[in-house]
C-alpha cells in the first residue's frame, strides 16, 4: 500500500493498481434494516442505465434436483452428519419449491445477485452500503427484489409491503407478484445448502465441519417455504 502524490492510497491487487477513494466503517450483518431505505437502495441499483453482458448463471435459476438431494442425503447419513435428518425433513418442501423454477425471466439486466446481509450493511454515517459485486450479472430484477424480501422481511407481510412500496416509489422496475418471482432466492439458497453439505463431506477437521454445518444451519433454522413466500406476497 502506498500513497499517490495527491495523498490518495493506491494498492497493487493482483497486478492491477487500485486506488482507495474512501474508507467506510460498516456495522455487522443485520437483516433488520430500515425497509424504506432498503427499497430505495435496491431501486437505485436496478435503475442504473447499464444492461451488461455477464450472462445468466444456473446458480440463480436451476434446481439442485431430486436425484442430487437423494444422493447427498445418503452420503450425509453414511457419514453421520448431525443435520442430515433435519435436512431430510425439509426435502419435500425443497422439491415443491424447485417445481417453481424454469420459467424464462420477464426482464434481464445486470443485478448484484448477492444482496444478502453480509454484502448490504449500515455504514458509519447511517446510510446503506452495498459491496462485493463479484457475482454481478444478468438476472431478473423482480427476482432480485424477491430475494431482498426473503432476507430482510422474513415472513412479515407488513415489512415486505414497506420495502416494495419504497422500491416502487423510487422507480424500481421489478415487481414481485407471484411465487415464480422467487426463483432466484429458491435456486440460490438450495445451491448454498448443497455446497455446504458437500464441503462438510470433504472437510478434514472438526473446525471445517463445524464451519460448513453452520452454513447449512442458516437455512435449516430459517427455511424458505411455500407458506413463507405466500406471506411475502400478501398485499
PLM regions and their residue ranges:
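Active-site acidic catalytic loop and adjacent metal/ATP-binding pocket
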Residues: 1, 98-144
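Conserved NTP-binding catalytic cores of kinases and kinase-like/nucleotidyltransferase enzymes
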Residues: 1-15, 123-125, 233-235
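Conserved structural core of kinase catalytic domains
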Residues: 5-34
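A cross-family kinase active-site recognition segment
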Residues: 28-85, 106-108
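Secondary-structure edge/capping motif, primarily at the C-terminal ends of alpha-helices
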Residues: 49-52, 101, 197-204
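ATP/Mg2+ or Mg2+-diphosphate-binding catalytic cores
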Residues: 71-82, 194-235
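Active-site activation/catalytic loop segments of kinase-like enzymes and analogous catalytic loops
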Residues: 141-173, 187-204
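All-alpha amphipathic helical-bundle segments outside canonical DNA-binding/catalytic cores
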Residues: 174-185
Amino acid at each position: 500500500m502506498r500513497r499517490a502524490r495527491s495523498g490518495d492510497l493506491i494498492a497493487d491487487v493482483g497486478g492491477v493498481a487500485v486506488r482507495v477513494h474512501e474508507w467506510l466503517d460498516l456495522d455487522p450483518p443485520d437483516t433488520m434494516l430500515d425497509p424504506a431505505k432498503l427499497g430505495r437502495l435496491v431501486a437505485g441499483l436496478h435503475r442504473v442505465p447499464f444492461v451488461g453482458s455477464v450472462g445468466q448463471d444456473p446458480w440463480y435459476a436451476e434446481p439442485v434436483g431430486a436425484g442430487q438431494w437423494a444422493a447427498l442425503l445418503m452420503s450425509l447419513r453414511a457419514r453421520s452428519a448431525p443435520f442430515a435428518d433435519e435436512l431430510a425433513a425439509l426435502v419435500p418442501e425443497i422439491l415443491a419449491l424447485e417445481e417453481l423454477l424454469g420459467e424464462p425471466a420477464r426482464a434481464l439486466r445486470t443485478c448484484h445477485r448477492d444482496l444478502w446481509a453480509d454484502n448490504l450493511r449500515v455504514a458509519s454515517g447511517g446510510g446503506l452500503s452495498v459491496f462485493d459485486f463479484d457475482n454481478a450479472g444478468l438476472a431478473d430484477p423482480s427476482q432480485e427484489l424477491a430475494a431482498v424480501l426473503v432476507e430482510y422481511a422474513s415472513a412479515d407481510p407488513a415489512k415486505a409491503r414497506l420495502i416494495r412500496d419504497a422500491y416502487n416509489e423510487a422507480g424500481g422496475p421489478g415487481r414481485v407478484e407471484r411465487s415464480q418471482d422467487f426463483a432466484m432466492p429458491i435456486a440460490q439458497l438450495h445451491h448454498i445448502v448443497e455446497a455446504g453439505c458437500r464441503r462438510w463431506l470433504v472437510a478434514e477437521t472438526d473446525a471445517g465441519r463445524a464451519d460448513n454445518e453452520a452454513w447449512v444451519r442458516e437455512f435449516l433454522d430459517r427455511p424458505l417455504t411455500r407458506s413463507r413466500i405466500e406471506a411475502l406476497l400478501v398485499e
